[in-house]
Every structure is written in C-alpha cells, then in structure tokens.
Amino acid sequence: MSILGVSIECKKSSTLLTFLTVRKMTRVFNKFPDMAYYRGDCLKAVYVTMTYKNTKTGETDYTYLSNGGCLHTIVMGSMVDY
C-alpha cells in the first residue's frame, strides 16, 4: 500500500494551498498514469509526501520532498525537472 500527497502553493499569499490527489482533476492539472503535471503561472512551491507500507513486513517508509519554486513533474513518486 502506498500514499502520494502533492501540495501546490501559489505566489499570492491570499491563495490557499491546492491539494492534488491521484483521483482529482481541475482545470490546471492533468492526470496521466503514474504522473501529474501542473500547468500555470502561480507556482511558488511544491511539497510531496510519500508513504509506503510493506504489506509483507508491515514496515512503513515516509519521504518528504519540497522544491524552491522551480516547475517540476511528479513521476512515480520522484520529483524531476520539467
């Protein structure tokens, strides 16, 4: 079992954080198999949390990633330059 959470923070402080899940689509997000693209000019930061639970051992691994404002693509749990 694994959980991927992605948060987008816009440059304007009055703009709330936008949460993207693999099952949600809005007009600024496109969903493709195992990846999510953000399109827009308000990007300030991207925060990614990944939680993976090994179903055989029961151990849980947690990873947190953030960027400094560059546009990135989230691909299969990895953050790569876009």
From Swiss-Prot:
Domain of life according to the entry? Viruses
The name on file for this protein is Protein C14
Please report the organism this UniProt entry assigns to the protein.
Answer: Vaccinia virus (strain Copenhagen)
